[in-house]
A protein has these predicted regions:
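Bacterial N-terminal signal peptides
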Residues: 11-23
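N-terminal secretory signal peptides that target proteins for export/translocation
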Residues: 1-8
């Protein structure tokens, strides 16, 4: 409880001192050139396409109040960095917030663009970058939502005002009590997650520990005995924050996620990555044992994942090109980029490596950067109702097993049950004895390796993906954990990099990254650690390449990185 109170206090201080560059953010932004395939209609689809996330009913969110009495949606959530969406599916919702269902059953959710749409500001002008890492404070949003709903469960006056907004002045008999019960049912798992998962040292803007939050939601809120499905002890502090990745060319990598544990290669593998994501972002999912399903589990009876929507979103992402640098520059540095790594070059790790007609090979290397995310991948949890569940050809989950393995089985099982008709149907006892291995195709077999822990060796104990650097200029802060504010700073030895810096939308086009002065999130400053604390989650250590280049060579390299 102390952790929650401190988190809420910190987020409130940050937001109370909010001084957004409102003129730039409110004005229509300049939409950067991201290729001919990326059209306005695709953009709007990307901003609002439902993927099955269910944050809360839309009428509730509209009626919800902040502690000072103002509507929770008063500024369209701009206080957290979310961007205005004039064509939102409901008034007041920002980019990346969705609505599914009808009438009182309309549910607000989140979609890819909430975390992967960026807006930067240069000299008072805002520039929109679709598919870019969002500069949003997701932890503050989560904590404040908890803070807004909590009083409704214990304060009659607060709940009466809330209920009047939803039910009207004269609700039918029993409606108030039913609404109160529904709010309490929503709040118990949500508050359990927030109280246990949000770290004392906040992620801050532009970062989150997505992997931990996926593990926490799935194993802490979804797979316990029904109801209420909770296994609170499975929820761990989400203290390995990373920078949101950019999406352009993500579908061309043969591996995704910062540690490289998610495979790419066909539509089902892309879907596996996205189903895992939506389970972490408010999808309703409660698998149940079922002896009449060939997998021994029913993954779809209580499952809000929108498989069609997820497929459409993956198709949209493939159309997003890297943003073209919109300002004047000298096109230099290509020769330096092409040098060997030990000569200060980049191409050996970050050049395009053609794997096949569809994919690029994505190297996984330990470059000395923060190691915390790898510890998250090794976490053990109680498997709850999923004890004994398995993928075809795989071993059953034990009573205590890896959170990573639970996620892999849950995602593969859901997709197999959805796409392979015989696996989605109930059967009589004789038919249910058929082994699921017998109905697997070459394509569905690839799901069995959709999630694989990265190979850790003595030479590379903590490897992370080395992505192609197209559009890297628009993706600050740098390193996988967002611990370095600019590319200029990244070309310095770790010991000489700045120890702390503010985070926001103001951009420095010369140093290529976050400007030294920010106002968007008030006084928030990200404090990093050095190489002596490599596992802090906030270490600025590692990637000491190009540090010995001359000042002229560094400037030429930065100019070249702007045009990739």
């Amino acid at each position: 409880m102390k952790r929650l109170k401190k988190t809420l206090h910190l987020s409130s201080l940050s937001l109370a001192s909010l001084a957004l560059s409102s003129a730039a953010l409110a004005a229509a932004p300049v939409m950067l050139d991201q290729g001919k395939e990326w059209t306005e209609s695709h953009r709007q689809d990307f901003y609002s396409r439902d993927q099955g996330s269910q944050v809360m009913p839309l009428p509730w969110l509209k009626a919800l109040r902040q502690p000072d009495g103002t509507p929770f949606l008063a500024d369209s959530l701009a206080r957290y960095g979310y961007l205005p969406n004039p064509k939102a599916p409901a008034e007041g919702l920002p980019v990346g917030f969705t609505v599914a269902g009808t009438g009182a059953r309309q549910m607000v959710g989140m979609t890819c663009s909430a975390c992967h749409t960026r807006q930067i500001e240069v000299k008072g002008t805002a520039y929109r970058i679709d598919g870019g890492p969002a500069i949003v404070d997701f932890q503050a949003f989560l904590a404040d939502l908890d803070r807004a709903v909590g009083p409704l469960t214990s304060d009659d006056a607060a709940f009466d005002a809330f209920a009047k907004q939803i039910l009207g002045a004269n609700p039918p008999p029993g409606a108030r009590d039913a609404l109160l019960a529904a709010v309490k049912e929503w709040y118990e798992p949500y508050h359990t997650l927030i109280e246990r998962a949000l770290p004392k040292d906040t992620w801050g803007p532009a970062r989150l520990d997505a992997v931990s939050m996926i593990f926490n939601r799935l194993t802490g809120l979804d797979i316990g005995t029904a109801p209420p499905y909770l296994i609170p002890d499975n929820i761990k502090a989400a203290d390995a924050p990373v920078r949101y990745p950019f999406l352009w060319n993500a579908a061309r990598q043969n591996k995704t996620q910062w540690p490289g544990f998610a495979a790419n290669g066909n539509d089902l593998l892309g879907l596996a990555r996205n189903v895992g994501e939506v389970y972490g972002v408010f999808a309703t999912f409660h698998p149940q044992k079922s002896k009449f399903h060939l997998l021994g589990m029913d993954y779809l009876k209580i499952n809000s994942a929108n498989f069609h929507g997820l497929g459409k979103l993956e198709d949209l992402i493939k159309k997003i090109g890297p943003p073209k640098w919109p300002w004047h520059l000298a096109r230099k540095g290509a020769l330096i980029f092409a040098r060997k790594t030990d000569e200060g070059g980049c191409v050996e790790c970050h050049g395009i490596r053609i794997k096949d007609l569809v994919l690029w090979d994505t190297p996984l290397r330990d470059v000395g950067s923060d190691s915390r995310q790898h510890a998250i991948l090794d976490g053990q949890v109680q498997t709850g109702v999923m004890e004994g569940a398995r993928m075809p050809f795989g071993q059953p989950l034990k009573a205590t097993d890896g959170a990573f393995d639970v996620l892999a089985v849950a995602v593969a099982g859901s997709i197999l049950q959805h796409f392979v008709p015989i696996l989605g149907e109930k059967h009589d006892a004789k038919a249910a004895a058929v082994k699921p291995e017998s109905v697997m195709t070459d394509e569905t077999r690839q799901l069995l390796t959709a999630f694989q822990k990265p190979v850790r060796t003595q030479a590379d104990p903590y490897p992370y993906e080395s992505r192609v650097l197209q559009g890297i200029w628009a993706a600050a802060p740098y390193l996988h954990n967002g611990s370095v504010p600019t590319l200029e700073e990244l070309l310095k030895p770790a010991a000489e990099r700045v120890e702390s810096f503010p985070v926001g939308s103001a951009y420095d086009v010369d140093k290529v990254g976050l400007a030294a002065q920010q106002t968007q999130f008030g006084s928030y400053v990200l404090k990093t650690t050095g190489c002596e604390q490599r596992d802090s989650g906030n270490s600025r250590c590692g990637h000491e390449y190009g540090t010995s280049l001359s000042a002229e060579e560094k400037r030429a390299l930065l100019e070249y990185l702007k045009v990739l």
